[in-house]
Amino acid sequence: MVDMFQFAAIVLTALSMSVHFGTWLTEAPIRETSSGAVFTEIQKGRDRVASRVMPILGNAAILLVAACVFLSRTVPIAFGLSLAGLVLIAADMAVTLTCNVPINKQVQGWNASAPPPVWAELRDRWEKFHTIRTVLIVSGFSLFTSSVVFFRVH
């Protein structure tokens, strides 16, 4: 049973992480050089999908990792790594909800052909917090996965 929880937690956390990492890797160069109109269209398009999928995916991943932390409590090193991973994954969610989502909601209300004069400042702020949350979830995923791969929990 532990193996099933660990497998599901790894898959869901990897999917969530891949959205953050893929966005950071592929869209950051476009955002840096694009016009306000292009930035707005990209953000609005991605967020139409992400705002529906990511809350479910992210919360399910956190719950499964939390279950794995509980199940690993008898193996101290696995417990510690899993718990550290969970804390970082939860911190990713906190940054997302308190920093990125409010900006996303603002952008959703913009007219792509006439973004507000402060669009570049909001883009840079969004990018800074996106980088932070990407580092958090990649680190959290790595710690959690190492607990599963290197330390057997029965």
Language-model segment annotations:
Residues 57-68, 134-142:
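Core segments of transmembrane alpha-helices
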